[in-house]
Curated annotation (Swiss-Prot):
Sn-glycerol 3-phosphate binds at T18, R88, E89, Y140, D255. This is Glycerol kinase 1. Its EC number is 2.7.1.30. Keywords: ATP-binding, Glycerol metabolism, Kinase, Nucleotide-binding, Transferase. It catalyses: glycerol + ATP = sn-glycerol 3-phosphate + ADP + H(+). The lineage of its organism: Bacteria, Bacillati, Actinomycetota, Actinomycetes, Kitasatosporales. PANTHER family: GLYCEROL KINASE, SUGAR KINASE. Inhibited by fructose 1,6-bisphosphate (FBP). GO terms for biological process: glycerol catabolic process; glycerol metabolic process; glycerol-3-phosphate metabolic process. NCBIfam families: glycerol_kin, PRK00047.1.
């Protein structure tokens, strides 16, 4: 049941994430009223390949929405809109007549398109489409994943060209199903998700015909690109139709953009970093498309209705929270993720050990898919506690590399970093981050800023909140860490970290 002080109405948000789907109901102050969450299976058919079963995910989404509404003790009349945020780049093709996926979804971490990306960049290199899309050619993005499916699923290209197949990232799949599926479901995506396909032109905010043709993706299967905060349709049909029919589906943002929005980084130069499976840092660059020369991505931050789009610079780190999971599940060095803080705190420093978790190559600012993980600086002195500390430091050093790149590209020094995501409950990590960045690190009251961002955008779309100033007024600081490290120590350790990073590169030989 809802707390007495949280009288309705409410906004709900679906977060279709990498490891789970959840739904959170928020009140007008941006406070959490109820949460429901369900994990889905991670499918690893081959090394470097990662898939999800999209039908399982849609079933889970329906369950968590119903679950969150039930836990809140509310009905459809109390909910003004529902918003969506999602794992980005994860790619799905489905049959528009049956609603059945033609293959498992290819997840953002999946590297099977490496060779295809090399092929696409053959004469011109990684930056072939960067000017238009803001992205380097990398296995991370959705366009090449769609092409891989078209090339590898029998008869699929013909069906796609005939208009029987729909392409979507997870936002598109969820919206299509929520709004009726085979019975008139809306086939749309928002500008933030579209900006991660490598098929959208940042300057026109539309699909780029030339690039789609070069990558080999038929325009017929692409969704319509819409803003991040507008009513796309309403909940219709199926289990949720009975329960919540008629509620407007009113926002979509890729998870990292949603966190930027939820952290109320509405001014140029404001930045947030989300610490989850991977880590993603975004800096608002206003209406300027800043091309990065330091290995960052240029992406759409958000677009509210018919207002001008707001752009962002992004640095992505593939492995952070998942490194802690690896320590727990594969190495058995800890029993729970929370235990790593206790273990790492039992020593003063890393004992000279550095851990670079390039499990699926290095993301920003290097973009080296030939890199693999390395633990460097090992001696007999090093214990599992030192390794635990090196694991946490890896996240902090990788963040430092990204803030350096952002300053270089944008000319804006980082004044403070707003943080969110599961790993921010680790106080040792947050202090280390502040030490390595030499800047304050601030955590808000509501750590679920991804869902909050989707709720905020949906609420703006239906007039539940009037403007971004209303949203800023909701932001509350829960904790702040300030630097407490001598400059010479910081510089010396950063040099060692960079040496360890060099050791990871060139491990995988080109399979020519």
């Amino acid at each position: 049941m809802t707390d007495a002080h949280t009288a309705g109405p409410f906004i709900a948000a679906i977060d279709q994430g990498t490891t789970s789907s959840r739904c959170i109901v928020f009140d007008r102050d941006g406070r959490i009223v109820s949460v429901d969450q369900k994990e889905h299976e991670q499918i690893f058919p081959k090394p470097g390949w990662v898939e999800h079963n999209a039908a399982e995910i849609w079933t889970n989404v329906q369950e968590v929405v119903a679950g969150a509404v039930e836990k809140a003790g509310i009905t459809r009349d109390d909910i003004k809109a529902i918003g969506i945020t999602n794992q980005r780049e994860t790619t799905l093709l489905w049959d528009k007549n049956t609603g059945e996926p033609v293959h498992n979804a290819l997840v953002w971490q999946d590297t099977r398109t490496d060779a295809l990306c090399k092929e696409l960049g053959r004469n011109v290199g990684q930056d072939r489409f960067r000017r238009e899309t803001g992205l380097p050619l990398a296995s991370y993005f959705a366009g090449p994943k769609a092409r891989w499916l078209l090339d590898n699923v029998e008869g699929l290209r013909e069906r796609a060209e005939a208009g029987d197949i729909l392409f979507g990232t997870m936002d598109t799949w969820v919206i299509w199903n929520l709004t009726g599926g085979v019975n008139g479901g809306k086939h749309v995506t928002d500008v933030t998700n579209a900006s991660r396909t490598m098929l959208m032109n940042l300057h026109t905010m539309q699909w780029d015909d030339k690039i789609a043709e070069s990558i080999g993706v038929p325009l017929a299967m692409l969704p319509e690109i819409r803003s991040s905060a507008e009513v796309y349709g309403e909940i219709t049909g199926g289990k949720l139709g009975d329960l919540l029919g008629g509620i407007p589906v009113a926002s979509a943002l890729g998870d990292q953009q949603a966190a930027l929005f939820g952290q109320t980084c509405f001014s140029e130069g404001e930045a947030k970093s989300t610490y989850g499976t991977g880590t993603f840092m975004l800096m608002n660059t206003g209406d300027k498309i800043i091309n990065s020369y330091s290995g960052l991505l240029t992406t759409v931050g958000y677009q509210i209705g018919d207002q001008k789009p707001v752009y962002a610079l992004e640095g992505s780190i593939a492995v952070t929270g998942s490194l802690v999971q690896w320590m727990r599940d594969q190495m058995g060095l800890i029993k729970s993720a929370a235990e790593i803080e206790t273990l790492a705190s039992s020593v003063e420093d890393n004992g000279g050990a550095y851990f670079v978790p390039a499990f699926s190559g290095l993301f920003a600012p290097y973009w080296r898919s030939d890199a693999r993980g390395v633990i460097a600086g090992l001696t007999r002195y090093v214990t599992k506690a030192h390794i635990a500390r090196a694991v946490l430091e890896a996240t902090a050093w990788q963040t430092r590399e990204i803030t350096d790149a952002m300053t270089k590209d944008s000319g804006v020094e980082l004044a403070a970093l707003k943080v969110d995501g599961g790993m921010t409950s680790n106080n040792l990590l947050m202090q280390t981050l502040s030490d390595f960045l030499d800047a304050p690190v601030v955590r808000p009251m509501v750590a679920e800023t991804t869902c909050l961002g989707a709720a905020y955008a949906a609420g703006l779309a239906v007039g539940f909140w009037t403007n971004t100033e209303d949203l800023r007024a909701n932001w509350r600081r829960a904790a702040e860490w300030t630097p407490n490290m001598a400059a010479e120590t910081r510089d010396r350790e950063y040099k060692s970290w960079l040496k360890a990073v060099e050791r990871t590169m060139g491990w995988i030989e080109d399979e020519e």
